[in-house]
Swiss-Prot record:
GO terms for molecular function: protein folding chaperone; single-stranded DNA binding; telomerase inhibitor activity. GO terms for biological process: response to heat; shoot system development; stem cell population maintenance; telomere maintenance. Required for the maintenance of meristems and stem cells through the reduction of DNA damage. Promotes telomere integrity by maintaining telomere length and proper architecture of the chromosome terminus. Negatively regulates telomerase repeat addition processivity. Hampers contacts between enzymatically active telomerase and CST complex. This is CST complex subunit TEN1. It comes from the Eukaryota. It comes from Arabidopsis thaliana.
């Protein structure tokens, strides 16, 4: 029997999510943080935006979060690529309001985390 495991959401910026990127794959687990630009209660679909890039978020599995357009949210979930238009939508498994976050500092922490993990991988290969 196949082992079912929930993968951690890889933190990315919306600028890194485009059709030829490593993150633009069906089922990949992602963590995204951006401003909510629109939300439909009827469909539970929101649109987040950061740096001129946007992403649809399906929030049907999220409870106890009230969505306010203009607030900043962080979502963790799996990316689905809708065919035939190759449009990405994140099926969120969790989400939270992170108003007050410094987005420039957040982007920098993502860069530093990747640098650290890369250095750790390299040092582990030497041992």
């Amino acid at each position: 029997m196949a082992k079912s495991q929930i993968e951690p959401g890889v933190p990315i910026t919306l600028q890194e999510l485009y059709p030829s990127s490593l993150f633009y794959k069906e089922g990949v687990s992602l963590r995204v943080t951006a401003m909510l630009r629109g939300y439909s209660v009827e469909t539970a679909i929101g649109v987040i935006e950061d740096g001129g890039r946007s992403l649809k978020i399906n929030t049907q599995n999220i409870r106890d979060v009230s969505f306010r357009v203009g607030s900043i949210y962080q979502f963790i979930g799996e990316l689905h690529i809708e065919q035939p238009n190759n449009e990405a939508i994140l099926q969120a498994r969790t989400g939270r309001n992170v108003d007050g976050i410094d987005m420039n500092l957040y982007r920098k922490t993502i860069e530093l985390l990747r640098q650290f993990l890369k250095e750790e991988d390299n040092s582990n290969m030497v041992e």
